Amino acid sequence: LRLSPGQIQYFKDRRVNLGNQPVEKQGRSLLVSEGLYQIDQHWRLYGLTFWDTQKHRPERDVISLDYQLDNDRFIKLAHHYGKGDYNQTTLAAVWRINPQWRLFYRQDYSTRHHRVFNNVAGVEYNDCCWAWRLAGKHWRDKPEDDKKHNAIYLEFVLKGLGNMGNRSGRMLKNEIHGFTPLAEEHEF
């Protein structure tokens, strides 16, 4: 069991802001608390909350249940909550079938709008000298948007020479926490 609370104490008003937002004048940041419970060798329960001590309510919360057989075989189920419309459930998985082949997937479902707003799925092949990855992505900019976007990512890697195609590895690292492209496993 691991519990970690934290908060920043500001001794002066901050002089930096983002865009048109007013400069923050509160003397303290949100109270951040994190907890991790390792259920057994493969299962763990994780929680994170950002608590507003002025308003006495949470700003953002995350709770997840993770199953991890090893670095290349894991499944994560998480629920994210935030002020406003941010209320979603995420399912993500990476599963290595054998030393060369691996599957990956992520789906985000808005529990407030009752619809899937982000899907990523694909397959990856890795050999001694080359690798390739094919991924499909289907998303909405916001869960409430009716407009949908689709993309297909195809990337070839000639080890020691470089990549051809769009850089799907970077997108997948952002989408699936813990994802590392197979071609990067043994880079020097």
State where each predicted segment sits:
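Long, low-hydrophobicity, solvent-exposed regions enriched in small/turn-prone and acidic residues
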Residues: L1-F188
